[in-house]
Swiss-Prot record:
Protein name: NADPH-dependent 7-cyano-7-deazaguanine reductase
InterPro entries in UniProt: GTP-CH-I_C/QueF, NADPH_dep_7-cyano-7-deazaG_red, QueF, QueF_type1
Family, similarity comment: Belongs to the GTP cyclohydrolase I family. QueF type 1 subfamily.
EC number: 1.7.1.13
Keyword NADP: yes
Gene Ontology CC, one term: cytoplasm
Record-linked PANTHER family: NADPH-DEPENDENT 7-CYANO-7-DEAZAGUANINE REDUCTASE
Biological classification of the source: Bacteria, Pseudomonadati, Campylobacterota, Epsilonproteobacteria, Campylobacterales
Key words, A-Z: Cytoplasm, NADP, Oxidoreductase, Queuosine biosynthesis
Pfam family of the protein (one): QueF
């Protein structure tokens, strides 16, 4: 097993690394992760998506390698589009307690179906 595979396999989402936000001003962090993949819980076929995260931090920010490893940890999991989006959103909201959080997952079309899931803290 190569070092990258080991990092992803051993990644514990509950230990996702966060850092103190040293800036008092209101600002938005935008992160795009274009290589999300998981397995369809029904067929086992791979699903691919681009993950868009936007948040206004309060006291914490997420470390970028940690979010990359977390997203990559879905690669061999059988999980629905809806569940993966909500799981990612819930973990980020729990760990960061941001002032605002928006998550969008734009899944590649498969079987003539294109799915986009959006979750917005301003609407919840």
């Amino acid at each position: 097993m190569r070092y990258g595979e080991m990092e992803v396999k051993n990644f514990n989402p509950e230990e996702i690394e966060v850092w103190p936000n040293r800036n008092d001003r209101h600002y938005t962090i935008k992160i795009t992760l274009p290589e999300f993949s998981c397995l369809c819980p029904r067929s086992g076929y791979p699903d691919y998506a681009t993950v868009y995260i936007e948040y206004v931090p309060s006291s914490l920010v997420v470390e970028l390698k940690a979010i990359k490893l977390y997203i990559n940890s879905f690669r061999d999991r059988h999980v629905s589009h809806e569940d993966s989006a909500n799981e990612i959103y819930d973990l980020l909201y729990k760990k960061l307690s941001p002032k605002e959080l928006y998550l969008k997952m734009d899944f590649n079309p498969r079987g003539n179906v294109h799915t986009i899931i959006e979750i917005d803290s301003k609407k919840n």
